[in-house]
Amino acid sequence: LKDPNGRGIIALYLSLLEESDAAALAARVVRAWIAQDTYVGSAMADKGLLAFAVGMDDGELAGLVRAYMRDNPGRRAQFDALVRALCANGRDRALQVLLGVARRHKMAGVQATAAALAREIASERGWSDEELADRTVPTAGFDGDGLLRLSYGDREFTGRLTSDFKIEVSDGAGRTRKSLPPARSGEDAEVVRAAKKRLSAARKEAKEVLTLQSERLYEAMCASRTWPAAEWRELLAGHPLVGRLVTRLIWTATPPEGGPLTFRPTEDGALIGADDAVVELEPHAVVSLAHRARLTDEEAAAWREHLVDYGVEPLFDQLSAAVPRVAKGQTEMRDLQGHMTDTFALRGTALKRGYKRGEVLDAGTFDAYVKDFAALGLTAVLGFTGSWVPEDKMVCATTSLTFTRRGRPVPLDRVPPVLLAECRADYAALAALGPYDPDWEVSASP
């Protein structure tokens, strides 16, 4: 019982059972392993029991793994086993957790393992890593028309996503409800419980999709990723959940001939420009996320006005961060060094912008917050004067912005312009926390 990958003999044996029985058995074994390993215990000697995860409901497995990683932050060996179990399960919700770890995790070894497993699955299916992420986004039970259909037997209910990704329920008469009603006399209690369970799971899953896909679309913008028009329509605009996020972003279509066109999808499926004119998406065009780095001042201003006029809350800012000028071969920015703040304020801003604590040095200090951009193989590094672990509130100052690839410095002129602009904005956000102090090196020593 050493291998948590159950895609061999365990999967074969589970396939001999009724699907519901196999899922129940698998869940019982995996839950027992986690219970034994939680807090003071360790079940690593029997990690092969996680092979049963191959037969679990992927949503249940995803929830268990997320909770374990959140509540047991230092268990690297267990994390390694769990990501292998996610890989073996191979269904959408399990893979989304695997892909999330592959994109960003505080343990580099666990992140590397997850990334390698994700590449393995993508290769098996004939997809790129990014295609795998696109094609495995859960729908939370919503149909292609954007509706969640729930049944009590004779009574039918419909769930619709609100703008903040909550689910609003309506009955057959169109009356809106916050939740599903209790069963009536004569209605099957099991059917009612199943509908309520489905709604609860859908609400949780929709919230997870909002968080994970917002992050992924932001990284796609930073990486200047492109989609063939047909794939963009199918996998993004046509997805019942991601499609709602797509309407809160500005896109660029570049046809084989001619210049790029910027547009925004509306909730009724139309594509419109900043001037409200309909934009035709050519079949052979490539689509990418727009950014201030590739827009004129006039275009950016027009889109700002458009978003206000339509009452659209952008999923994230595409129109503010400008590309800084850098010299050839320059490897760091230091023009915003010496801005004074405290370690808690700096930490809060860095974490909010997607960064995590950098490597802890031998003396128990750290002096950077880092953010990985896996698709580009780059890590952004926001330097500061440092703090101790465990942390206390103390004076600190900003120092630098750098980028690394596999631990080595990367010249700034080789960083994609959009990524450079966005990380420069992160650097500026830290500097904005406090004024410049000409004696910062003395004032902010850790």
Predicted regions and their residues:
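Non-catalytic terminal/accessory regions
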Residues: L1-G90, L95-Q96, A102-P446
